[in-house]
């Protein structure tokens, strides 16, 4: 039997529909909640996390009003496995119960939410809140997915990446070719050619910054706020696929970070070793990503400004985070490769703003993960979880009311990752290809100790096995 079949899907709850009304009297610290998910946002690309060359004034200002978690990590990677833990508060890793769906990515954990698992939005709806969802993350709406379950109002902003929205018959092959790197074979770039063809078909009619994906998402989110001013209580989830690639922000953002570049506009990375890029091309690709980050920051800021104007932040818990980062050549890789679980992929921002201002401007070093967010939201809004949660209340963690974790674990495809107070470790699920770093002495994870510290490697792998409840699937 495949190890992936050994363990039933986690969670307890009704098999269908929104759960019965549970405690939702508002006895928590907030009446409403907004969760902003910004896909592929590296923590180290924000000023509030120490970056000194990328402009992120909105998130930096928000950090001054929020509790900032300095050691926040995904529970599962990439997009949809991470969303499952975010939407349910239950662990998705180690991906034991998984069947690939036709027409979707064949990655462990990339699947719909099991019927027996209750989402945070179902719990909120069952407690009488108006639940609202806005996103351009097109994976949510593939035929096999069901993540909009429990939202009473939702909107899909079309056109990001490979969303089959625009007609590819309108795209010229030579326009696609100009976006492809030189020196790679046709077989190597074929998937990029398909993706970029659809991208150009989707984005061909942009005329101003407002027509780009993140601006469209946040403009629509503003309209949703305006439409729902009269509701008694609400839960809003804004899921922006930006700053996910392709990276082609308006030119003014690119000029901030790489003025005068004259080479090819390589807006889509080829996943794998980064040495196919020249030094100038790699620098420019990093500038493209930085430009996307600054654009997303601007529109998040405009959205929050509108929420303030409408008085809809006054009694609202606000959380901003990301699902994972992106490799940009730091360890010789570019993309989101599951074999490279270094800081550039694993460190994510996590800002939690209480409406009463408690903890504003503080930094919390306790480990936090994305599946902590549902427990945090439900506790803050006085909604009883419909089932036991795997995550913990981040506000209680920040206040010292609960013991911090001694370590955290996560997984991506057939690789798993663990961090404790001293070390970070990752390897294949079968223990092959181990990497080990001592974080205080080596925060950039440049000096691999796995070969010389075999005892520590074994200890860290045992922590993974304990968290997984047994052998890891291979």
Spans of model-derived segments:
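Catalytic domains that recognize anionic headgroups
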Residues: 1-474
């Amino acid at each position: 039997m495949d190890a992936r079949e050994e363990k039933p899907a986690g969670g307890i709850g009704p098999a269908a529909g929104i759960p019965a009304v549970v405690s939702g009297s508002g006895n928590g610290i907030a009446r409403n909640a907004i969760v902003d998910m910004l896909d592929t946002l590296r923590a180290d690309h924000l000023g509030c996390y120490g970056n000194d060359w990328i402009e992120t004034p909105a998130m930096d200002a928000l950090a001054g009003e929020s509790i900032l978690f300095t050691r926040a990590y995904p529970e599962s990677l990439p997009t949809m496995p991470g969303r499952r833990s975010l939407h349910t508060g239950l662990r998705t890793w180690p991906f034991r119960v998984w069947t690939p769906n036709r027409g979707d990515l064949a990655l462990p954990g990339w699947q719909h939410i099991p019927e027996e698992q209750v989402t945070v939005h179902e719990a909120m709806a069952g407690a009488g809140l108006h639940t609202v969802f806005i996103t351009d993350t097109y994976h949510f709406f593939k035929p096999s997915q069901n993540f909009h379950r429990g939202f009473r109002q939702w909107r899909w902003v079309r056109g990001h990446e490979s969303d089959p929205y625009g007609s590819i018959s309108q795209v010229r092959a030579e326009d696609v070719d100009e976006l492809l790197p030189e020196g790679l074979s046709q077989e190597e770039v074929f998937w990029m050619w398909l993706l970029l063809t659809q991208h150009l078909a989707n984005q061909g009619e942009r005329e101003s910054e407002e027509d780009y994906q993140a601006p469209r998402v946040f403009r629509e989110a503003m309209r949703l706020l305006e439409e729902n001013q009269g509701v008694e209580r609400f839960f809003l989830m804004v899921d922006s696929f930006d700053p996910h690639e392709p990276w082609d922000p308006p030119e003014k953002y690119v000029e901030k970070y790489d003025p005068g570049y004259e080479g090819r506009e390589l807006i889509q990375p080829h996943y794998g070793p980064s040495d196919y890029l020249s030094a100038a091309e790699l620098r420019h690709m990093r500038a493209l990503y930085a430009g996307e980050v600054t654009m997303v920051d601007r529109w998040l800021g405009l959205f929050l400004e509108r929420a303030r104007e409408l008085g809809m932040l006054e009694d609202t818990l606000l959380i901003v985070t990301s699902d994972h980062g992106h490799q940009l050549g730091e360890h010789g890789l570019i993309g989101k490769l599951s074999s490279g679980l270094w800081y550039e992929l694993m460190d994510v921002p996590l800002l939690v703003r209480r409406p009463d201002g408690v903890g504003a401007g503080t930094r919390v070093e306790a480990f936090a993960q994305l599946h902590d967010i549902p427990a945090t939201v439900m506790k803050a809004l006085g909604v009883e979880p419909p089932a036991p949660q795997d995550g913990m209340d981040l506000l209680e963690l920040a206040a010292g009311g609960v013991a911090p974790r001694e370590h955290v674990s996560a997984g991506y495809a057939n690789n798993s990752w663990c961090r404790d107070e001293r070390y970070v470790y990752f390897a294949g699920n079968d223990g092959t290809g181990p990497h080990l770093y001592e974080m205080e002495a080596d925060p950039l994870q440049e000096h691999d100790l796995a070969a010389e510290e075999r005892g520590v490697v074994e200890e860290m792998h045992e922590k993974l096995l304990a968290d997984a409840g047994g052998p890891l699937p291979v």
